[in-house]
């Protein structure tokens, strides 16, 4: 615990000490914009910003203009959080179209309803700073839709002049990365921010070493990380020469669906945008008692009939 690969310990030494090694470091670092001025005061990563808010170390954004670079779910979390921290104006800056954003449509709609400005087809070019080295704005290059590449519309500059978007805080949310340097030095294949495993989660050139989760798949959901862990655990078990079968100490009945009538899902309502931006309470309203009872009857009892963790 508390050891750093490449500094305190190496993959080779771990491999000599253990029969198998699993790399599951997640994707905890942020991708950089790679533009002038990125080291200025007031330029922060979305992950560190949201982590601080979660630790009750929220920055005071009262009266500020805040810009967030990116179009994913993390950027939506960042803009909506900034609004709740008192920012006067919050803008999303994205180099593609709204339709190309990877954020859930409901998140985008929620942000717009809360007064977030969405600036699309704007590619960051450089960061402007004041005399104290603090961010004062970001210059962007207008973009236009271009050729289709890999099934997705690419963008290219329109030829118009760059213009400045004023901001006193700039949050970068263009994706997450892994600390790959020391793994690459150890012979672990790394490409474009991911550890490149074989289909079984291991490496042909480094027997006994495996990787799984966000560091191998790229940033994903918690449930996908859990699923990846189950797969790689089974593969490590087989690599070690075992074929353990996970079982439970209860008798699992045969699935039965004959007593389940099809029923639509309850659609939750949301609090008014003007009200919810003032606090960090839930956006969705609770179900009524009748709705909760109806929704509970839709449960297929996967836990009881041998699915989920018992599968």
Where do the PLM segments sit?
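Feature captures the FAD/FMN-dependent oxidoreductase FAD-binding
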Residues: 1-35, 126-139, 144-147, 169-171, ...
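Mid-to-C-terminal Rossmann-like scaffold of FAD/NAD(P)H-dependent oxidoreductases
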Residues: 115, 123-129, 134-135, 146, ...
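Rossmann-like dinucleotide-binding cores of NAD(P)H-dependent redox enzymes
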Residues: 79-126, 244-259
């Amino acid at each position: 615990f508390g050891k750093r690969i490449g500094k305190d310990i190496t993959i080779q030494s771990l491999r000599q000490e253990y029969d198998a090694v699993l790399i599951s470091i997640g994707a905890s670092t942020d991708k950089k914009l790679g533009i002038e001025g990125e080291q200025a005061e007031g330029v922060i990563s979305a992950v560190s910003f949201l982590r601080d808010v979660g630790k009750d170390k929220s920055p005071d954004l009262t009266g500020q203009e805040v810009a967030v670079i990116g179009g994913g779910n993390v950027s939506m979390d960042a803009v909506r959080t900034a609004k709740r921290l008192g920012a006067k104006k919050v803008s999303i800056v994205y180099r593609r179209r709204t339709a190309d954003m990877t954020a859930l449509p409901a998140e985008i709609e929620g942000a717009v309803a809360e007064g977030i400005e969405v600036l699309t087809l704007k590619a960051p070019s450089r960061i402007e700073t004041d005399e104290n080295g603090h961010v004062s704005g970001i210059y962007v290059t207008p973009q236009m839709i271009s050729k289709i590449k890999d099934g997705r519309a690419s963008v290219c500059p329109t030829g118009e002049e760059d213009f400045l978007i004023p901001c006193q805080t700039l949050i970068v949310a263009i994706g997450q990365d892994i600390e790959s340097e020391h793994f690459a030095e150890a012979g672990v294949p790394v490409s474009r921010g991911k550890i490149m495993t074989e289909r079984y989660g291991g490496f042909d050139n480094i027997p006994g070493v495996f990787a799984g989760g966000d560091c191998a798949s790229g940033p994903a959901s918690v449930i996908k990380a859990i699923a990846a862990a189950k797969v790689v655990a089974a593969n490590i078990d087989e690599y070690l020469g075992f074929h353990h079968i996970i079982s439970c100490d209860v008798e699992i009945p045969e699935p039965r669906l004959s007593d389940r009538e099809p029923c639509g899902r309850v659609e939750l309502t949301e609090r008014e945008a003007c009200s919810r931006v003032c606090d960090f309470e839930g956006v969705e309203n609770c179900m009524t008692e009748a709705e909760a009872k109806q929704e509970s009857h839709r449960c297929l009892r996967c836990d009881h009939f041998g699915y989920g963790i018992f599968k």
